[in-house]
Amino acid sequence: MVRPILHGTDGIRGKISASPKTDLEALEAIVHRREVNGRAFMVIGEAIGQILAEELDDHPKVVIGWDRRPGNAMLVSGLTDGLHSSSVRVIHAGIVATPGLHDAVLGTKSDAGLMVTASHNPHTDSGVKFFDAKGRKSMPSL
């Protein structure tokens, strides 16, 4: 049996959709229908926060950037809420190109960065890319 994959080669992406009522439904929307929503991003933010807290044994700092896609405000809000629930300090870089997030991670001395975008995908899609403390794209163990 093939296990569904949540994280692709360049982050998590999908069509922006409304948030379902439960965390499980939100994650199933990504895995089975490739739909992203604020609730799923809250769960993702919480998971990232827990991983960082375990690795760093402190209150990690994460910088979030995003592009102008409709629906990104909902996704950023979800990530922020999830990170805060794991005691992560969040800095919003605001609307920035993906290479700008690299600079924001380094400039703020953050432990990680999250870029909410879907790059070249249609404007109805969005997602999140992960950056490590050196501003490099990485593949967190989610």
Predicted regions mapped to residue ranges:
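An N-terminal, well-structured beta->alpha segment
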Residues: M1-L79, S85-S86
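Short, intrinsically disordered, charge-balanced linker/junction segments flanking boundaries
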Residues: P140-L142
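Ferredoxin-reductase
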Residues: E55-K137
